[in-house]
Regions:
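Core segments of cupin and vicinal oxygen chelate
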Residues: 42-93, 133, 140, 159-162
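Short, small/polar residue-rich loop motifs at catalytic or cofactor-binding pockets
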Residues: 154-156
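Leucine-biased recognition of intrinsically disordered, low-complexity hydrophobic segments
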Residues: 15-18, 28
């Protein structure tokens, strides 16, 4: 039986165990994931996006131009030229790569402001200490609630908001 074929019904001799707490990175045989490194978001104003996510509490790890054959080959856009800003969550694993495309310019989806059930990247959620304070700090940077701040049982206050370039973010405040 090849590695890709299914075992006969009842034959468990070739089945591999699911990852366990003692081996969390093992997935599908020898293929592994070490970690989720970052989420990439295309923006139309890199400075505004950096200011927004800095106000949210992220730290700017660095900014750099991205261009050349290697970059175009990776993303499938020959002759591309962009600038990226890598933002990180302090003292936690989690980074956002904000990218401003100069060549070719970014494509605006139609409709420009898509609803929450649009296929593709849905949203990025951040746990915050105080949801109302966070919203108050983000509003001057263009943040707008999508719905309303809502209590989920006795566990969380939750909301969706739009940030720079129409990015949907979710905020979650854990209730004690």
């Amino acid at each position: 039986m090849s590695r890709c074929s299914r075992p006969a019904p009842g034959d468990s001799s070739r089945l591999r165990a699911l990852p366990t707490a003692s081996d969390p990175a093992r997935i599908l045989g020898d293929m592994t994931i070490q970690r989720m490194d970052n989420v990439g978001i295309v923006v139309d104003d890199l400075d505004a996006a950096v200011a927004f996510f800095t106000e949210l509490g992220m730290e700017l790890e660095g900014r750099m131009p991205t261009e050349g054959a290697w970059a175009g080959n990776v993303v499938g856009l020959r002759g591309m030229r962009s600038e990226i800003a890598m933002m990180r969550v302090p003292d936690a694993p989690g980074r956002l790569e904000l990218a401003k495309y100069h060549t070719p310019t970014a494509i605006t989806p139609k409709p420009e402001i898509t609803p929450a059930n649009t296929l593709g990247l849905h949203r990025v959620m951040f746990a915050v200490d105080d949801i109302e304070d966070t919203l108050a700090r983000l509003r001057p940077h263009g943040a707008e609630l999508v719905g309303e701040v809502t209590r989920y049982e006795d566990s969380y206050l939750l909301c969706y908001l739009r940030g720079p370039s129409g990015i949907i973010l979710a905020l979650a405040e854990q209730l004690s």
